[in-house]
Amino acid sequence: MKKSLLLLLLIAATIPVSAQSFWQDLYYEPGFDLGHYTPFSANHKYIADYLHYGLDVRIGQEHQGILIGYTHNTLDSVIYYTHEGNRYGPIGDCFSLAYFVDGHIYKGKRWSFDYDIIFGADLWTRHGNEMLGSALNFHVSFDLGPTIRLSEQLDAAIRYGYYHSSNGATFLPNNGINSHFLRMALRYHPNGRTEPLQPENQAFKKKNNLMISEGLGWLQTYTRVGDQLPNETPFFLGNTFRVGFSRQFHRRFRWDVAVDLLWTGETRYCHELEGVPYNFWNSTHLAASADFEAQFGRFAFCAGAAYYLYHGSKLLPEFYTPYYERVGYKFYLGKNRNYYIGTFMKIHLNSIDYIEWTFGVNLF
């Protein structure tokens, strides 16, 4: 456990910094978290009886920073069973290293109502159970709440938020950890407060673009053999190609609507289980989608949803719903920020399909 914490601290220390002003502008925000688990299916209702609590430190500048945290789970002492009777051991504790962006929903003279968007990595001391299929997992959380100015150097912050940790179905079984939490923190500005960044002098101009993106990923199957997951769960390729219309309507916000052409190799596995002939086109899907993004410089946090218009086969993975969600982030490249790379989670009603690794471009 100590070695794992040391590893995360060393990673944080390697974040490249050069300018002296970087250190002068930093604030330090130690906090305490208290939360409860959120069941994701009927046979997991018992986890709502267990709490988790932890400590974290956020080190940041204007609207961004890093988070280093430790979480202890009271569920760690429980031996539990699934509805199939499989015996699983405790989850263990969690070490987190993450990047965050924040902003004001309302800003007054003495207080503000703020949001935080956090993503990074979690290292769990135990894994290979129904909840977590691997030790290293993705960390995603969101929170909202007031920040109260106590003095020129000190703030008090209260946040209520949602937290998720999983590996994106890369290794199964992997239902993931979901929870709601309350966070209380003090923010210290050792060198005083950073002056807010001034908006660009030139007037903002709204932009319309033709948007094209390609996202690849891989997954293990959720499709069961009878009532059980298969003993050997091979990996399958997933792909999402999007083409559509994108509009930058604010300095910080953009939306798009698109047609998604999808392909999943898992369909072949469904055909093999039923003894039905398979061809390449059985794995295709067509959907109409819409995404929204909030931008912080070159970084953008994205969320969206899509509705299926067509399936190449009636034999679909068992967790498929008529719609799916997508959440992730982009990093814009190029002088005019017309290109981007990103990572997205494709989700069917709380079940993560897979992680997409995306490259895209906004044309014209």
PLM features: residue spans?
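Bacterial Sec-dependent N-terminal signal peptides
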Residues: 1-29, 111, 148, 190, ...
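Residues on the lipid-exposed face of transmembrane beta-strands in outer-membrane beta-barrel proteins
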Residues: 53-61, 97-103, 117-121, 142-148, ...
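Outer-membrane beta-barrel "beta-signal"
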Residues: 178-197, 352-364
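Transmembrane beta-strands of outer-membrane beta-barrel pores
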Residues: 30-38, 61, 70-74, 119-127, ...
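Outer-membrane beta-barrel translocator domains and adjoining extracellular loop/strand segments
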Residues: 38-45, 76-83, 126-131, 168-175, ...
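Solvent-exposed loop/turn segments connecting transmembrane beta-strands
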Residues: 47-50, 89-92, 107-109, 169-177, ...
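Surface-exposed strand-loop-strand hairpins of Gram-negative outer-membrane beta-barrel proteins
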Residues: 33-54, 80-90, 220-242
